[in-house]
C-alpha cells in the first residue's frame, strides 16, 4: 500500500483511506442509524469539520438533552478523508478525542456520547449531508500572509469554505438549517455563501430560500475547553426571519443559554463583524504592550508586576502580558479578514484601516525579540549563539493545549535556526509539530513560515522530545515559551542538575517569579526575560553580596 493511501494519527497508528466500496456501505449504515434516531425523536445534526472547534462542538450538540434528561440530537461529524486528517474519524468512533487538551471533559464528553448515549458518530462521506436537519460548518477560512510584518499584502483563503458550502447545498434537504460557525470575512454569509447555495438550489429545482445563519465560537482551548463552547455567551444571526428563528431555537437547545443568554443580531454581517472586532480589540491591546515590554526591559521595570498593579482597577482587569507572540487561529488573522473584506467583498478602494493591521504586524514580529535575548544571554556567558544547543519548552500557542497554529514558538525556532543554533523542542501536549515536519506542504504548499527565514531545510527533521529531563542534558540555553503547568512547576536546582551545568535562560511569558530568578542566578545561569527588566537588579544584588563575601574573606572577617 502506498504511503499516500494511509492516514497516520499523532500516536503513529495507520488508517487506510476508504475505498469506493466502503463509501457505499458507509452511507447505507448512516442512513439506517439516522432513521432509527429520528424515529426516537432526535434531530439529525451534521457537523462539517472535526478540528479544534468542530470535534468539541459535535460532542456538545450530541450531549444535549431535554428537561427530562433525554437526548435530543444525533450528530454525524464529517471529516474529509485526507492523509492528514482521516484518522480523526476513526479515533472519534472509538470514543477517543481527536484533539488533545488539559480539560478532562473533552475526553469524557466524547466517550459518553459515542459509547454510552450513542448520539455521536464520525464519517468521511459527504452524503451524510442528505440526512441533516441542521448543518454546522466548522471549516477553516484562513488568511494567507504574503510577507512577514505586513498583513495588508495577504488575502482571505475562501476556497475550502466555498467548496464546503457548495457541497452542502448539493446534498442537504431544502429545509435544513446551515449554521456557519467559522470565523469569516464580514459579508461572507450573505454575499458569498448565500449566492452559492441559491444557485445550486435553483439547479436542483428547489424554489425555497436557503436557511443560512452565522454564529461565532468563543472557544478557548485549555482547562475550560468544553465550557467555553457550551457555557458561554454566544452571538447569532440569520439571513432571513426563518433562519434567525431556527438558529436561535437550535442554540437554545444545545447550549446553556439559561445562564448565558444569546445575543441575536439582525443580519449575519453584524455577527461576522462582531467576531472580527472582538478579536481585533484583543490583538490591539496585546500589540500595545509590545513597546512597553521593550521599555521595561531597558529601564529596569518588571512589566509583570506593572500589569498586576493595573489589573486591580476594574476597568482594566482584562489587560494581560503578551507573551512571546500572539498565536492561535484567530488573533493573528481575523483583523486581516476585515481589511480584506472591505476591499474585495464590498469594493471600497479607500484605506480606512490603520490600527487593526498595525496591531497584527506588531504581534507577528514580537516573537523575533526572544532569539535576540537568547543571543545576548549566551554572549554574556562567553558563548556564541551559532552552534549553541537550545531547548525550547513549549510549542503551542497558549498553555494547556496542543494547538500550534501561528504559535510564537514556531518563529522562535525558525529565527534561532537561522542564527545558527541547534534547537530541540519539548511540549507535553504534542506528538508532532507539523509546521516543521511537513513544512513543504503545511498549511499548504509554498506558504510555510520557512519562506521568511534562511537555513530552514533541516527543520523538516525536527521532532518533539518525549523526555524533557533527558533533553536538558548538556544544553547551552533554555527558552521558557509557554505557560504549561509542567513548566511553571520546574525546580531550578533540578533543572540545572539535569543540564549538568549553568546555562542561558530566557523567560518569554513570565513563568519565573523573583525567587526562581534569584535561584537560577545563584546557580550560575544567565537569566533574561521579555518585559522583565528588573532581572538585572536581582543579579546586581547577588553579585554585590558575592563581592562583599569575598572582601570579608580576603581581610579575614
What are the residue ranges of the model-derived segments?
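Structural/interface elements that position substrates and couple domains in central-metabolism enzymes
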Residues: 2-557
Amino acid at each position: 500500500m502506498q504511503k499516500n493511501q494511509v492516514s497516520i494519527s499523532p500516536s503513529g497508528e495507520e488508517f487506510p483511506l476508504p475505498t469506493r466500496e466502503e463509501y457505499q456501505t458507509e452511507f447505507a449504515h448512516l442512513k439506517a442509524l439516522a432513521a432509527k434516531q429520528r424515529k426516537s425523536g432526535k434531530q439529525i445534526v451534521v457537523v462539517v469539520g472535526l478540528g479544534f472547534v468542530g470535534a468539541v462542538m459535535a460532542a456538545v450538540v450530541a450531549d444535549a438533552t431535554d428537561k427530562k434528561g433525554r437526548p435530543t440530537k444525533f450528530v454525524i461529524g464529517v471529516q474529509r478523508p485526507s492523509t492528514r486528517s482521516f484518522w480523526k474519524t476513526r479515533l472519534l468512533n472509538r470514543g477517543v478525542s481527536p484533539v488533545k487538551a488539559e480539560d478532562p471533559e473533552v475526553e469524557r464528553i466524547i466517550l459518553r456520547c459515542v459509547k454510552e448515549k450513542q448520539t455521536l458518530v464520525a464519517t468521511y462521506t459527504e452524503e451524510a449531508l442528505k440526512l441533516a436537519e441542521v448543518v454546522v460548518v466548522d471549516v477553516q477560512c484562513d488568511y494567507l500572509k504574503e510577507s512577514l510584518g505586513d498583513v495588508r499584502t495577504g488575502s482571505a483563503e475562501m476556497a475550502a469554505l466555498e467548496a464546503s458550502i457548495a457541497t452542502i447545498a448539493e446534498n442537504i434537504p431544502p429545509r435544513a438549517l446551515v449554521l456557519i460557525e467559522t470565523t469569516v470575512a464580514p459579508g461572507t454569509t450573505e454575499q458569498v455563501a448565500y449566492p452559492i447555495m441559491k444557485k445550486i438550489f435553483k439547479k436542483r429545482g428547489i424554489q425555497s430560500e436557503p436557511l443560512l445563519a452565522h454564529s461565532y465560537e468563543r472557544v478557548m482551548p485549555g482547562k475550560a475547553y468544553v465550557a467555553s463552547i457550551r457555557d458561554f455567551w454566544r452571538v447569532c444571526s440569520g439571513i432571513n426571519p426563518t433562519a434567525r428563528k431556527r438558529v436561535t431555537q437550535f442554540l437554545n437547545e444545545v447550549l446553556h443559554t439559561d445562564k448565558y443568554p444569546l445575543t441575536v443580531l439582525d443580519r449575519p454581517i453584524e455577527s461576522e463583524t462582531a467576531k472580527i472586532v472582538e478579536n481585533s480589540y484583543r490583538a490591539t491591546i496585546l500589540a500595545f504592550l509590545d513597546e512597553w515590554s521593550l521599555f521595561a526591559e531597558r529601564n529596569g521595570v518588571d512589566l509583570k508586576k506593572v500589569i498586576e498593579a493595573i489589573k486591580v482597577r476594574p476597568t482594566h482587569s482584562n489587560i494581560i502580558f503578551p507573551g512571546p507572540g500572539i498565536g492561535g487561529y484567530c488573533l493573528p488573522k481575523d483583523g486581516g479578514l476585515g481589511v480584506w473584506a472591505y476591499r474585495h467583498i464590498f469594493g471600497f478602494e479607500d484605506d480606512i484601516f490603520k490600527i487593526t493591521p498595525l496591531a497584527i504586524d506588531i504581534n507577528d514580529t514580537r516573537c523575533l525579540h526572544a532569539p535576540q535575548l537568547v543571543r545576548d544571554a549566551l554572549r554574556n556567558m562567553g558563548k556564541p549563539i551559532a552552534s549553541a544547543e537550545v531547548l525550547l519548552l513549549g510549542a503551542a500557542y497558549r498553555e494547556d493545549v496542543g494547538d500550534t497554529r501561528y504559535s510564537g514558538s514556531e518563529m522562535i525556532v525558525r529565527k534561532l535556526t537561522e542564527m545558527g543554533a541547534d534547537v530541540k523542542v519539548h511540549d507535553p501536549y504534542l506528538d508532532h509539530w507539523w509546521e516543521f515536519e511537513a513544512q513543504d506542504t503545511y498549511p499548504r504548499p509554498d506558504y510555510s513560515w520557512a519562506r521568511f527565514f534562511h537555513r530552514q531545510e533541516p527543520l523538516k527533521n525536527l521532532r518533539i522530545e518525549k523526555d524533557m529531563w533527558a533533553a536538558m542534558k548538556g544544553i547551552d540555553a533554555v527558552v521558557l515559551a509557554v505557560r504549561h503547568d509542567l513548566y511553571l512547576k520546574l525546580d531550578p536546582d533540578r533543572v540545572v542538575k539535569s543540564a549538568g551545568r549553568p546555562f542561558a535562560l530566557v523567560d518569554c511569558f513570565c513563568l519565573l517569579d523573583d525567587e526562581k530568578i534569584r535561584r537560577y542566578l545563584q546557580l550560575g545561569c544567565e537569566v533574561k526575560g521579555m518585559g522583565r527588566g528588573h532581572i538585572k537588579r536581582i543579579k546586581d544584588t547577588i553579585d554585590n553580596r558575592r563581592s562583599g563575601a569575598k572582601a570579608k574573606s580576603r581581610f579575614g572577617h
